[in-house]
Amino acid sequence: MYKKLVFIFIAALMGACTSRQQADEKTLYISILPLRSLVGEIVGDDFKIEVLVPPGASPETFEPTPRQFIGLNRAEMIFNVGLIDFETTLLSKIEERGKVVNLSQGIELIAGSCSHAHTPAKQAAAGGDDTSCAEPHNHSHAHGVDPHVWTSPRALQKMAQNAYAAIRRAYPDSAKYETNYKRLQADLRALDARTGEKIAQSGIEYFIIYHPALTYYARDYGIRQVAIEADGKEPSAKRLTQVIRQARED
């Protein structure tokens, strides 16, 4: 009996220590998975990075767990695209609004189609003007803003700049973050140049994609995106025929 009590006491003590360590651990929250590596390249292993929307889940139907909501309020910083509905709804409830970082700030935004549940243009990041989609079959009337800014290496450079600016404000004495950021920007600039060069050499004028997720990529590199999907619905036989005919003719 004595040995059993000692074992229970030690187990409880270890559990308390683990809980204390978890509470003391500095955590950053990221809204969607594509942003994780961007922020991680700057901060390295100094923070635990939590992603809100798990792999395979849809941001359009995502709802945070109670544990995630508690974690958000305890987080050092929260990085988000700033253009997806769940971000606007969820992050407006965060007590410390100053720790929420909008990574799309300053990017020239593109009007989205109604195939997405996106933040309306009037609620989108300041500093970006809506433009028509780079894809000819996309509706340009008011259905919000296309949020897929991270698909363009050119836009990623601005997102990295926004992330670093926020991190530097919070941790001005860390020279390591500046070094990491400069290395990241050099890599992104090289990727941008290489992408533009390869596309120019290929002579590609457009590409066909099921879901219109590469609008910023198409815009930034002077090509057109032809989406098979229309307004979030499966394509009709007529639409499929149009796309096939266009591909054959070109």
Q: Model segments located where?
A:
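Generic N-terminal leader/processing signal
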Residues: 1-2, 18
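Hydrophobic h-region of N-terminal signal peptides that target proteins for export
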Residues: 10-18
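Extracytoplasmic metal-acquisition and chelation regions
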Residues: 17-250
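Sec-dependent signal peptide recognition
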Residues: 2-8
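Intrinsically disordered, low-complexity segments enriched in polar/charged small residues
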Residues: 8-9, 123
